[in-house]
Amino acid sequence: MQLSIQAIIGFVVAAGLAVASELPSPMTVNLERRKMLVTKNDTVDFKAVRKQANALNYKYDKLLRNFRKNTGRDHPLLHLLLDLIDKRDGKGDVDLDDIGEGQLWAGDVQFGQSKFKIDFDTGSADTLVNPFVYFPHRSKSSRKTHHTFSTAYGDGTTASGFIYTDDLKIGGYKAKDVAIGLSVTKFINDEDNQGIAGMSFPAVQSFPKKFDPFFVALVKQKVVPEPVFQFTLKRGSGSTLHLGGIDNSRFQGELSYVDVNPEDGFWISEGKVNGKKIDACIDTGSSIIFGPIDEVREVITKMDGVTPFTAGGALHGAFDCSKPPKLDFEFAGQKFNLGENQVSFGKYQGQCVLSIMGQKNLPMNAWVVGDSFLQTASVVFDMGKNRMGFAPSSN
């Protein structure tokens, strides 16, 4: 009999109450922002924006395919699946140097004897690294599973490799036999950051079911005191990933919670943008905010002083930098106003570019809500109670 992840977490939490005094305290991982979508003079690099948009489209396409494979049904928010190139044997030359663009938040981890920075992504569920980063032969605890993985990217190609298990050290915690996918091709073009650690639910993972996402492994092994993690992202320094509990110093006031359905795989919530109801996937792997083009157009056309324009096939908005428009998101009844540094992500022809953009043919009928919002809030991801908590981040 197979138990759901919620049943396992519930059992672990209940069992853990008896030994709470033996559990370590919550731990914090300091995060660094890798690259931005602007040039040195703060001009929007629309080529980089287009690359990230394509990468996100293919990322969600692959995740929705994973969902179908893992559950036997289509995701309730499925819009369409892209015409991907399917290389089932995992062979062939794959040029992925332009994929990812390092637009995530990176922190330190150690698998076996290999230490490196990795991006933490609430919009995916697997841990993958570039070649020549993780060295399994140097680790006595490493095991090659003989299972493979294959992940699609924005140019229609795939990154492939073998899945290993090894001891993981992160933020002072240590877990055994955690799955890591070692790619045979480079898929992140960033010397400092060498991989992605997914923090979504198992329903969207590419790896076989027996290989848990890393945070689920921490929970099952009772390494963390609570099945909770917390992202607080800031412009500049001070961004953190808090594991195993809630750091109240990272936010103002009280957390407001919304329920999530772990069977959907994603951290999805109903919300509002400038009063318009939306479905939102909270994704630390996105630098800006993407939405269905018709919904974004509806929002932009109602914003005072914002002029719609198209670049790279996507809908954007431009405004006078000295007169930033009102842009707010609402979750769990709490509003978050995007400030001057969040409402725009760069400049174009002397004007500021709005930090939301619309795309045609998104794989999901949902908004992908990334950094521009996350820099205003501290967000708690609670796998034990299947909910997300939102509060304004502290100064």
Swiss-Prot record:
E.C. code: 3.4.23.-
Pro-peptide region(s): 21-88
Pfam family, one: Asp
Protein activity control: Inhibited by pepstatin A.
Record key words, sorted: Aspartyl protease, Disulfide bond, Glycoprotein, Hydrolase, Protease, Secreted, Signal
Location of the active site: 121, 283
Upregulation: Highly expressed during exponential growth in rich media. Also part of the 3 most highly expressed extracellular proteases in minimal media. Expressed on human skin.
Secretion signal span: 1-20
Domain of life according to the entry: Eukaryota
Compartments it resides in: Secreted
Disulfide-bonded cysteines: 321-352
Main location: secreted
GO CC annotation: extracellular region
Gene Ontology molecular function: any one: aspartic-type endopeptidase activity
Glycosylation sites: 41
SUPFAM superfamilies named among the record's database cross-references: Acid proteases
Domain Peptidase A1, chain residue ranges per copy: 105-391
Gene Ontology biological process: proteolysis
Family: Belongs to the peptidase A1 family.
Function noted in UniProt: Dominant secreted aspartyl protease that has a clear preference for aromatic residues in the P1' position directly adjacent to the cleavage site and, in particular, Trp. In addition, it generally cleaves peptides containing Lys, Arg, Phe, Tyr, or Nle (norleucine) in the P1 position, Nle and Glu at P2, and Arg and Val at P2'. Has important roles in facilitating the interaction of the yeast with the external environment. Is able to rapidly hydrolyze Staphylococcus aureus protein A, an important S.aureus virulence factor involved in immune evasion and biofilm formation.
Name the UniProt record assigns to this protein: Secreted aspartyl protease 1
Record lineage: Eukaryota, Fungi, Dikarya, Basidiomycota, Ustilaginomycotina
